[in-house]
């Protein structure tokens, strides 16, 4: 796995299942992305106790699952702080008619846990800019979206892809406002 490439959804799902952790890959990734976007330090392990509290009643994770979470944290941090403005979401990519329902559910889980991660990190959302407040409101609305099995599934799949892109844009905007700034970008102004 490269520095900016997420692990496969199924690999993370299998690891969480083996560790008997009741968290999906989408929930885990959304939570980590939210904590990072909320201003959590990326230079230490302060995210781990929050993760343990939120997902496992404060109990530590088995080492293999924690390594998977650490890799996911590192990739997500690299993507959010990159100048490329690219964020990939850890969502299932199954085929077939049922895949759209699984994707919609996973996206809802990702968004809900992203918002929770913002709260865990202590983001001062009440002091957010109008753009960030609008992005957060959009995320809250998108978390409630679903797929209607009576409608054209192909059309809904296309709309879902547009929603996913909007989720990414909202997350990047929120991170730009609340995310911890790297010290290398803080160059003093010389007069």
Swiss-Prot record:
Family that this chain belongs to: Belongs to the UPF0149 family.
Stored InterPro entries: YgfB-like (IPR011978), YgfB-like_sf (IPR036255)
Name of the protein in its database record: UPF0149 protein VV2847
Organism: Vibrio vulnificus (strain YJ016)
Pfam families in the record: UPF0149
SUPFAM superfamilies on file: YgfB-like
Gene3D superfamilies referenced in this protein's UniProt entry, alphabetically: YgfB uncharacterised protein family UPF0149, PF03695
GO cellular component: cytosol
NCBIfam families per record: PRK01736.1, ygfB_yecA
């Amino acid at each position: 796995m490269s520095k900016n490439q997420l692990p496969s959804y199924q690999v993370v799902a299998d690891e969480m299942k083996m560790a008997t952790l009741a968290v999906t890959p989408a929930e885990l990734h959304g939570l980590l992305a939210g904590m990072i976007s909320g201003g959590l330090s990326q230079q230490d392990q302060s995210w781990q106790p929050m993760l343990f509290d939120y997902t496992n009643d404060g109990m530590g994770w088995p080492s293999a699952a924690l390594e998977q979470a650490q890799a996911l944290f590192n990739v997500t941090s690299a993507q959010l702080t990159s100048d490329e403005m690219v964020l990939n979401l850890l969502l299932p990519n199954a085929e077939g008619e049922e895949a759209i329902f699984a994707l919609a559910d996973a996206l809802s889980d990702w968004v809900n846990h992203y918002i929770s991660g913002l709260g865990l990190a202590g983001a001062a959302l009440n002091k957010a800019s109008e753009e960030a407040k609008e992005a957060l409101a959009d995320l809250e609305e998108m978390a409630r979206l679903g797929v209607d099995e009576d409608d054209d599934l192909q059309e809904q799949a296309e709309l879902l892809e547009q929603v996913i892109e909007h989720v990414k844009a909202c997350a990047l905007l929120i991170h730009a406002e609340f995310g911890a700034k790297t010290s290398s970008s803080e160059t003093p102004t010389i007069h």
